Design a protein with these regions (language model features):
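Alpha-helical membrane-protein topology signature
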Residues: 1-194
Length: 194
């Protein structure tokens, strides 16, 4: 029961983070990186689907479903509002790996292998945002990134509470926890003089 409560709190935190992020984007306080967000739109749905099949537990995967919907909304909303940054070559690499993971899942019917392969484009997808925020910490505000991190921390606790002797179920939320927290930490830095 407590795992369902933690999962629910994680989803609420996730949704609140998306609302805050989209408001900041409209005010020009956050600049969604086109590479990162376009890869997320393509990859998070597959990530969610493979995680559901891999873990066999929808409660563990609910945050990924919320993230998939939130990423898709944010991408198209920022695209419509003209707030996305320009694309760069990292997109192609991550998308190719994502398509490869899709093929692995389809061909071998192995969701676990596909989900582990998907962790590579997930990391790659964050790199453009990391590069942008390292250059200019004002590209992002820390709050939504820390809220997303907190949501993934709760998801890690949910996975542990619903343990099924599948340690790979932890890889995805741990990956997301550190990737999101890193953006939040870089967003808190003051801009370095040129």
């Amino acid at each position: 029961m407590i795992s369902v409560v933690l999962s629910s709190i994680a989803i609420i935190g996730h949704v609140i983070a998306f609302v805050i992020y989209n408001k900041q984007m409209l005010k020009g306080e956050s600049r969604p990186n086109a590479a990162t967000w376009s890869i997320w739109v393509l990859g998070v749905g597959l990530n969610c689907a493979t995680y559901i099949v891999m873990s066999g537990d929808i409660i563990k995967a609910l945050i990924l479903l919320a993230g998939s919907l939130g990423c898709t909304w944010t991408f198209f909303f920022s695209l419509f509002k003209g707030k996305l940054t320009r694309l760069n070559p990292w997109d192609i690499v991550a998308m190719i790996i994502g398509f490869f993971a899709s093929f692995v899942w389809w061909h071998y019917r192995n969701a676990t292998m596909a989900n582990m392969i998907l962790q590579i484009p997930i990391v790659i997808s964050f790199l453009p945002t990391y590069r942008g925020i390292i250059r200019n910490p004002r590209n992002e505000k820390a709050l939504p990134w820390f809220l997303w991190s907190g949501a993934y921390l709760l998801t890690i606790f949910t996975v542990i509470l619903r343990w099924q002797d599948k340690p790979l179920d932890l890889v995805n939320p741990i990956n997301y926890l550190f990737l999101h927290a890193g953006i939040g930490l870089f967003a808190q830095r003051k801009k370095l003089p040129s």
